[in-house]
């Protein structure tokens, strides 16, 4: 049985100008913002209180509609510096956003555009006036939901046709989205993290050369590696091992990204396996972690609801410490499938799902969470130093 859920917001609208229609036929009404049109995607919820610009521009959110549980939105505006997409003009992040409140006019010295106009520019459809926490409960009960988000300023909707559209989209399983968001050519990177009253600076040192395989990489990951004195060469997701080794890297990074890891594995896994055999230090994050797991013979699974937010407790078995981390993934490594020569290094304390691994006897490790944050806490920044410690050991013995 399907239902129509009207907007609960106190401000009144003569008729809804935006809808969220789930694959089961449920219709959620509200006020439209941002771009107009129709977009399909998997609906997930994000519990972060800040960083909406970074979240919406994370390429890992390709083909996803984000339900923000924090009620306020837009109060710091947007700027041209906090975008996480490597190629910001290509709009590789989320396709839709769902908000509790109407978008607030910005009050921040770094803002150069309000969120509503920014959403239009980036072709992101938004739905305001939704009981986002009730929608979150629905996702927690039923699991990840597929659907479509529609914005028409005139409020003209063919509900029957739109429900059929929502039912047709099959979801993220078996989708290789890394090929849609990856760089198309080699790119050199030297920008370091933002510093108060100074902005972003460039790295003049060249202590290490890192090749970063771009499955949908975030800018802040690159900045943190540059802060360690690394010269970084970003390469497309399908770059073969011969081209990578020809660049004489001191380490290789496997980036985050969207989609089903088993689909991306078709071309990524052979390269990763060859890199493991080369004994070059390897570090993977998010999708890179999942691809590394597949490369050693483990399995990945689709999660019930995924982990998306900046307040996730993760335990590091090596340091025996608990850190609060940012997460953004709907697939996970199946712990029981890890082979004997691979050690689990991190777990989520929410559901005990795998959050890290290392290959015993090899300078190779990865994590499911996002140590670069952006947005989120910096508890896991030490993982970048762990990577560079492996690189220094490798350079001494090479």
Curated annotation (Swiss-Prot):
It catalyses: hydrogencarbonate + L-glutamine + 2 ATP + H2O = carbamoyl phosphate + L-glutamate + 2 ADP + phosphate + 2 H(+). Belongs to the CarA family. This is Carbamoyl phosphate synthase small chain. It is an enzyme of class 6 (ligase). The active site is at 286 (nucleophile), 370, 372. Small subunit of the glutamine-dependent carbamoyl phosphate synthetase (CPSase). CPSase catalyzes the formation of carbamoyl phosphate from the ammonia moiety of glutamine, carbonate, and phosphate donated by ATP, constituting the first step of 2 biosynthetic pathways, one leading to arginine and/or urea and the other to pyrimidine nucleotides. The small subunit (glutamine amidotransferase) binds and cleaves glutamine to supply the large subunit with the substrate ammonia. GO terms for molecular function: ATP binding; carbamoyl-phosphate synthase (glutamine-hydrolyzing) activity; glutaminase activity. Pathway: Amino-acid biosynthesis; L-arginine biosynthesis; carbamoyl phosphate from bicarbonate: step 1/1; Pyrimidine metabolism; UMP biosynthesis via de novo pathway; (S)-dihydroorotate from bicarbonate: step 1/3. Residues 209-397 form the Glutamine amidotransferase type-1 domain. CDD domains: GATase1_CPSase. The keyword Ligase applies. It comes from the Bacteria. The gene is carA.
């Amino acid at each position: 049985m399907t239902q129509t859920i009207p907007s609960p917001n106190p401000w009144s609208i003569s008729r809804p100008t935006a809808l969220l229609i789930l694959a089961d036929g449920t219709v959620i009404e509200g006020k439209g913002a941002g771009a107009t049109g129709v977009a399909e995607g998997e609906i997930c919820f994000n519990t972060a209180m800040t960083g909406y610009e970074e979240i919406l521009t994370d390429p890992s959110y390709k083909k996803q509609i984000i339900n923000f549980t924090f009620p306020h939105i837009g109060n710091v505006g947007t700027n041209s510096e906090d975008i996480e997409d490597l190629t910001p003009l290509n709009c590789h992040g989320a396709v839709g956003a769902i908000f509790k409140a109407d978008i607030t006019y910005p009050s921040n010295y770094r803002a150069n555009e309000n969120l509503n106009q920014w959403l239009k520019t980036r072709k992101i459809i938004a739905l305001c006036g939704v009981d986002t926490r009730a929608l979150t409960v629905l996702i927690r009960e039923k699991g990840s939901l597929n659907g479509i988000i529609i914005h028409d300023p005139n409020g003209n909707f063919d509900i029957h046709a739109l429900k059929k559209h929502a039912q047709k989209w099959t979801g993220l399983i078996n989708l290789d989205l890394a090929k849609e968001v990856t760089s198309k050519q080699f790119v050199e990177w030297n920008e370091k993290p933002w510093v108060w009253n100074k902005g972003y600076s460039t790295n003049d040192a060249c202590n290490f050369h890192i090749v970063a395989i771009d499955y949908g990489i975030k800018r802040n990951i690159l900045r943190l590696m540059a802060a360690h004195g690394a010269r970084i060469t970003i390469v497309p997701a399908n770059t073969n091992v011969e081209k990578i080794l020809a660049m004489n890297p001191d380490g290789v990074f496997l980036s985050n990204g969207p989609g089903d890891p088993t689909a991306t594995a078709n071309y990524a896994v052979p390269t990763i396996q060859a890199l493991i055999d080369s004994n070059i230090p390897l570090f993977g994050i998010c999708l890179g972690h999942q691809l590394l797991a597949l490369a050693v013979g483990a399995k990945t699974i689709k999660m019930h609801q995924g982990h998306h937010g900046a307040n996730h407790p993760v335990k590091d078995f090596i340091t025996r410490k608990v850190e609060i981390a940012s997460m953004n993934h709907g697939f996970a490594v199946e712990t029981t499938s890890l082979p004997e020569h691979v050690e689990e290094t991190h777990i989520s304390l929410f559901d005990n799902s795998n959050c890290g691994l290392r290959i015993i006897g090899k300078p190779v490790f990865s994590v499911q969470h996002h140590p670069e944050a952006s947005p989120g806490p910096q508890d896991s920044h030490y993982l970048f130093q762990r990577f560079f410690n492996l690189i220094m050991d490798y350079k001494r013995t090479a």
